[in-house]
């Protein structure tokens, strides 16, 4: 009888990937990035361990949404004070802090526990094409072609 091999954290190889978000559909991009962060693209995937890779997302300011979501989709945050609710549309938040849109979409697709917080730390999002992670030699990650919006 074969035994199931559980990889130890010392044996897990961590790679760095760079993903270009230009003209990509937000949800489809977030799904693939969350899968790589979890390590589901590896044969050594284990649900309760961090076996995933680091992901650098560039051009977050050029991500797209379909339909009327640019004006209808709302992002809410609360300061914790009475009357402290702030509401902002997708278009307004994309003008102000485009990284937050991609981060929030990906974070919602990760586990909502300590493991999810640990996985989220391996995500780096930048609004331009430049990033400071050249020393890690990130490999370009090819997204599914159906994720792009023409």
Swiss-Prot record:
Keyword Ribosomal protein: yes
Region called Disordered, residue ranges: 130-150
Gene3D superfamilies: Ribosomal protein L13
Keywords, ordered alphabetically: Ribonucleoprotein, Ribosomal protein
GO cellular component, as recorded: cytosolic large ribosomal subunit
GO MF: mRNA binding; structural constituent of ribosome
Extent of Polar residues compositional bias: 136-150
Entry-linked InterPro entries: Ribosomal_uL13 (IPR005822), Ribosomal_uL13_bac-type (IPR005823), Ribosomal_uL13_CS (IPR023563), Ribosomal_uL13_sf (IPR036899)
Keyword Ribosomal protein found: yes
Subunit structure: Part of the 50S ribosomal subunit.
Function description: This protein is one of the early assembly proteins of the 50S ribosomal subunit, although it is not seen to bind rRNA by itself. It is important during the early stages of 50S assembly.
Protein name: Large ribosomal subunit protein uL13
Organism this protein belongs to: Synechococcus sp. (strain RCC307)
Taxonomic path: Bacteria, Bacillati, Cyanobacteriota, Cyanophyceae, Synechococcales
